[in-house]
């Protein structure tokens, strides 16, 4: 059964461009080989980690959104687990599409001088 998934991968922050392109190619190849449908692959950049992982305080985040079955998730996570450059990964099944949350706008308060003038 084909379902929607998203995966966040944290890799070492000091990887070169060739290694990053190799990681991108690896993920897209796994999804294509397992007959999945890749929707989005985003590089979120280097960010500070909440706690050190393998003596690293920073990590480069990647967001992957795709359609596939359980075998695809199992293979993707197995291959990520074996890669030394990957610090952490987390895959989540998307139950239903949610619209982007609307931006919260703070209510405008009337100035005390404007109230006194009325």
Swiss-Prot record:
PANTHER family: MITOCHONDRIAL 28S RIBOSOMAL PROTEIN S6, SMALL RIBOSOMAL SUBUNIT PROTEIN BS6M
Disulfide-linked positions: none
Gene3D superfamilies noted in UniProt: 3.30.70.60
Gene Ontology annotations of biological process type: translation
Keywords: Ribonucleoprotein, Ribosomal protein, RNA-binding, rRNA-binding
Organism: Geobacter metallireducens (strain ATCC 53774 / DSM 7210 / GS-15)
Family, similarity comment: Belongs to the bacterial ribosomal protein bS6 family.
Region (Disordered): 98-118
Name by which UniProt lists this protein: Small ribosomal subunit protein bS6
Cellular component terms per the entry's GO annotation: cytosolic small ribosomal subunit
Alphabetized GO MF terms: small ribosomal subunit rRNA binding; structural constituent of ribosome
Coiled coil: none
Keyword Ribonucleoprotein included in the entry's annotation: yes
Biased composition (Low complexity): 99-118
UniProt keyword Chloroplast, yes or no: no
